[in-house]
A protein has these predicted regions:
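N-proximal low-complexity "stem/linker" segments adjacent to membrane-targeting elements
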Residues: 1-71
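Residue-level recognition of the N-termini of beta-strands and the immediately preceding loop/turn
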Residues: 33, 82-87, 113, 155, ...
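Phosphate/oxyanion-binding active-site loops and adjacent basic polyanion-contact surfaces
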Residues: 55-66, 133-142, 166, 170
């Protein structure tokens, strides 16, 4: 291999080498990643009777989540420049002031990121009556996200909400893990990155 132990042994889209497992030929290659990022910058924790950890306005969590996601995508793009990353933000009624903060972060990123508003009307006849508007909005946001993933996803679709922070290598590790595991089992897989 002619590599040091602290260097990457794997080559994206070709082979995955994990020391205890050996080499896996990559047959399930990732050429594009669609990220569906769900936001609601005004609603606090709608389904729980507790406060957020740092008790900041929800927009602060959304901005930090998006910023960490952008850093992770940029990190992945430097390692894997041939992978196409696209992000669609599904926004649920954010105030204009908050949307402008998100747009500023997007404009500074130079990544392929767009914002699409949640279409509540489209799901009124599909989702049964809920106890409150927040539950309906959450379900509608999920449905719209799944539809966007089905319509625009090519290889890998990553669904994420606006209150998760990401380590810089998160996206790269997810792509590499998907390629390795899906190639081992010779099937597309569903992955759930954890906290």
């Amino acid at each position: 291999l002619q590599k040091e132990l602290n260097e990457d042994l794997s080559i994206i889209n070709k082979k995955s080498i994990v020391l205890p497992l050996g080499e896996v030929k990559i047959t399930k290659r990732v050429n594009s990643v669609l990220i569906i990022f769900r936001t609601n910058t005004d609603i606090e924790i709608w389904d729980q009777n507790k406060k957020r950890l740092f008790e900041e306005p929800k927009i602060e969590y959304s901005l930090r989540a998006l910023k960490s996601l952008i850093k992770s995508v940029n990190f992945s793009k430097t390692k894997y420049p041939n992978i196409n990353f696209k992000t669609i933000i599904v926004d649920d009624k954010s105030k204009e002031e908050n949307l402008n903060k998100l747009k500023k972060l997007i404009d500074e990123s130079s990544l392929d990121i767009s914002i699409t508003p949640l279409n509540h009307e489209k799901y009124k006849d599909i989702i049964k009556q809920q106890r409150n508007d927040q539950t309906f909005s959450n379900l509608a946001s999920l449905l719209q996200s799944f539809e966007l993933g089905k319509e625009h996803g090519e290889d890998l679709v990553f669904f994420v909400e606006d209150d998760y922070l990401h380590f810089e290598p998160m996206m790269e590790e997810m792509v590499a893990s998907y390629e390795r595991i899906a190639s081992q089992v010779n099937k597309d897989i569903f992955m759930c990155p954890t906290d």
